[in-house]
């Protein structure tokens, strides 16, 4: 506890304990030789009702986990299954600390968080909902449905307010985008004749190979599971170089059908998201969420300089992310104080 307090200060005393600190404790326990860590299911599953509810939850939210148990002869009624922590590299999963910057509601958001239509991003006419704007446990199921309705209503208002002032589509730009989008199909059609078998081609890169390459880069150079979530500036600088090389190769993606075309464009988007994650992780010179990631060169939380949001804007021409800070207003806390 003392070592965590030295790292994050008073946050260690918050109740409930922040998710990242629970993950941190998990990692330290395993590093100290205290593994494996297990989920206690045997006691609960003795109750038939709790067993039914438990399986409804497992099969409803983590069906892959149930399949892993079945494949390893694990019955959670008889064995407490092992747990392994592996958060995605966009910070925090359920407790994510990331999302697009969007305008808040008129009746609640501070001026700096509100510039127009509810849930509209900084791109005019582009609206977001759910995990797009930052994931929390409140955005499961009904939460994401509700936020979708809010964004949808705001988008309708935006369209109605345009009236006859509608944007015009450049036909030449539209045709150029069509060629670009379907290019992986053409790359495969031409390149497949250069090989007699297998998946390795001198002319095209399959989406799966590109995805595996991306995962390796992010794991090794952006604080992934294989590195125990540890990262520093030199690692990320090299990671950015490797991502740029991967982006160059994406022009040669090949797709043998529409499903692989979907995978090809998913890979484009994942690489862009990965670049963004790398840029934000490098810009924030502190360890804000130990248990999700650790900056080896800035191992402590630094509220004096980094109690803020970090915002990025992507420059399509230069391919660079421009970073800036934005203030954090504790809206709920302030309203609680006002009510008291």
Q: Where do the language-model regions lie?
A:
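Alpha-helix termini
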Residues: 143-144, 161, 302
């Amino acid at each position: 506890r003392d070592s965590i307090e030295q790292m994050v200060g008073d946050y260690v005393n918050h109740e409930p304990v922040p998710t990242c600190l629970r993950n941190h404790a998990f990692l330290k326990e395993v590093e100290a030789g205290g593994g494996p860590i297990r989920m206690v299911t045997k006691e609960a599953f003795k109750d038939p009702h709790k067993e039914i509810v438990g399986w409804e939850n497992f099969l409803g939210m983590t069906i892959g986990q149930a399949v892993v148990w079945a494949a390893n002869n694990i019955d959670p009624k008889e064995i407490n299954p092992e747990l392994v922590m592996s958060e995605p590299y966009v910070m925090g999963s359920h407790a994510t600390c990331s999302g697009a910057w969007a305008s808040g509601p008129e009746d609640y958001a501070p001026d700096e968080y509100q510039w127009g239509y509810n849930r509209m991003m900084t791109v005019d006419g582009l609206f977001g909902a759910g995990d797009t704007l930052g994931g929390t446990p409140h955005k499961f199921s009904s939460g994401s449905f509700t936020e979708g309705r809010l964004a949808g209503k705001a988008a309708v208002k935006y369209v109605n307010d345009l009236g006859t002032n509608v944007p015009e589509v450049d036909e030449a730009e539209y045709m150029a985008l069509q060629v670009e989008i379907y290019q992986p199909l053409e790359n495969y059609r031409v390149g497949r004749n250069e090989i007699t078998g297998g998946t390795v081609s001198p002319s095209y890169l399959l989406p799966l190979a590109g995805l595996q390459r991306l995962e390796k880069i992010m794991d090794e150079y952006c604080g992934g599971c294989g590195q125990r979530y540890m990262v520093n500036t030199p690692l990320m600088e090299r990671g950015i170089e490797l991502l740029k090389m991967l982006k160059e190769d994406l022009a040669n993606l090949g797709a043998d059908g529409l499903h692989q075309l979907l995978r090809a464009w998913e890979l484009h988007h994942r690489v862009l998201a990965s670049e963004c994650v790398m840029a934000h992780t490098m810009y924030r010179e502190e360890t804000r969420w130990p248990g999700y990631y650790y900056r080896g060169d800035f191992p402590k939380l630094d509220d004096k300089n980094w109690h803020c949001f970090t915002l990025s804007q992507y420059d399509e021409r230069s391919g660079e992310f421009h970073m800036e800070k934005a203030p954090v207003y504790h809206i709920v806390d302030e309203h609680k104080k006002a009510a008291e």
